[in-house]
Amino acid sequence: MSITPERKAQLIKEFAGKDGDTGSPEVQVAILTERIVNLTEHFRGHAKDNHSRRGLLKMVSQRRSLLDYVKKKDQARYEKLISRLGIRR
């Protein structure tokens, strides 16, 4: 269910603006999206896992807040991010 450190490092490298950039909204959204996708796959086999579902909803909400922030600050950056991640809006 969680992402491997290698995959996390790959996402950071792919979405970071510069070296060592782990806290930018783009990186945070990319990591959250990966975790959300993994949890969604988990629910295909464990439909009644309500404790994990709550965590999923919290992650989706946090991602939504970060995306709203990016959209408010820079519309072009927001559109580029959602197209790269394949998030529909």
Curated annotation (Swiss-Prot):
Transmembrane segments: none annotated. Signal peptide: none annotated. One of its GO terms (cellular component) is cytosolic small ribosomal subunit. InterPro entries: Ribosomal_uS15, Ribosomal_uS15_bac-type, uS15_NS1_RNA-bd_sf. Keywords: Ribonucleoprotein, Ribosomal protein, RNA-binding, rRNA-binding. GO terms for biological process: translation. GO terms for molecular function: rRNA binding; structural constituent of ribosome. SUPFAM superfamilies: S15/NS1 RNA-binding domain (SSF47060). Belongs to the universal ribosomal protein uS15 family. Part of the 30S ribosomal subunit. Forms a bridge to the 50S subunit in the 70S ribosome, contacting the 23S rRNA. One of the primary rRNA binding proteins, it binds directly to 16S rRNA where it helps nucleate assembly of the platform of the 30S subunit by binding and bridging several RNA helices of the 16S rRNA. Forms an intersubunit bridge (bridge B4) with the 23S rRNA of the 50S subunit in the ribosome. This is Small ribosomal subunit protein uS15.
